[in-house]
């Protein structure tokens, strides 16, 4: 049982370390508005992951590679990421002072961040695929233990994202990147567009 837990926890954490749309959204928001604002995105991301975990735990296999639901998820995620990336690329720019005040960008509410994080997690087909694959390997494991694994993974997602937000929103980090926020926004926007193109390409390849 301990070996299985270490396998599940290790695979999940390694997947978590891979930077994706959630990571870039959290870092940008924390740099601009502080970790408390970014925590809304963190909670939304954790809830989105929790929904996919719940579906995988329940044994619902509708979201599988090649299925209509998975294809719809791929295209919806691609369009959402492309929209986010384009918004950042066409932004007139944001300046920030070391006290955390910003100019040129509205301060998002906590609830708005939660909705953005939830959408980012739910519209990421890699999340659905990862959890479906992981729970398929646990078919012989007691359901109660699978549920505990699910709770553990949601907690780790939330804890890790909050840690990223706290690090990016630290005063020393903000001071270091205060003069480069426009470049960070452009890089973030370009990265999200590239991810969107990659997801769309996969969707076309799976037709």
Question: What residues fall within each predicted segment?
Answer:
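Alpha-helical membrane-protein architecture signal
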Residues: 6, 10, 107-119
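Hydrophobic/aromatic residues within the transmembrane alpha-helices of Major Facilitator Superfamily
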Residues: 13, 17, 50, 86, ...
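Alpha-helical transmembrane segments and their lipid-water interface positions
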Residues: 22, 48, 52-59, 81-84, ...
């Amino acid at each position: 049982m301990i070996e299985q837990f270490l396998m599940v926890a290790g695979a999940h954490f390694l997947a978590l370390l891979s930077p994706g749309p959630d990571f870039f959204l959290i870092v940008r928001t924390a740099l601009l508005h502080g970790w408390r604002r970014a925590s809304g995105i963190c909670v939304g991301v954790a809830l989105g992951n929790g929904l996919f975990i719940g579906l995988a735990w329940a044994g619902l296999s509708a979201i599988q590679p090649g299925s209509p639901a998975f294809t719809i998820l791929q295209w919806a995620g691609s369009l959402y990421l492309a929209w986010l990336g384009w918004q950042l690329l066409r932004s007139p720019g944001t300046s920030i002072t070391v006290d955390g005040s910003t100019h040129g960008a509205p301060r998002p509410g906590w609830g708005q961040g939660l909705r953005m994080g939830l959408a980012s997690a739910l519209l990421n087909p890699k999340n659905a695929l990862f959890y479906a694959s992981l729970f398929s390997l646990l078919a012989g494991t007691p359901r109660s233990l699978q549920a505990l694994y699910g709770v553990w993974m949601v907690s780790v997602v939330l804890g890790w994202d909050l840690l990223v937000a706290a690090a990016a929103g630290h005063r020393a980090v903000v001071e270091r990147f205060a003069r480069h926020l426009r470049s960070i926004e452009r890089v973030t926007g370009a990265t999200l567009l590239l991810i969107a193109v990659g997801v769309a390409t996969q969707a076309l390849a799976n037709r």
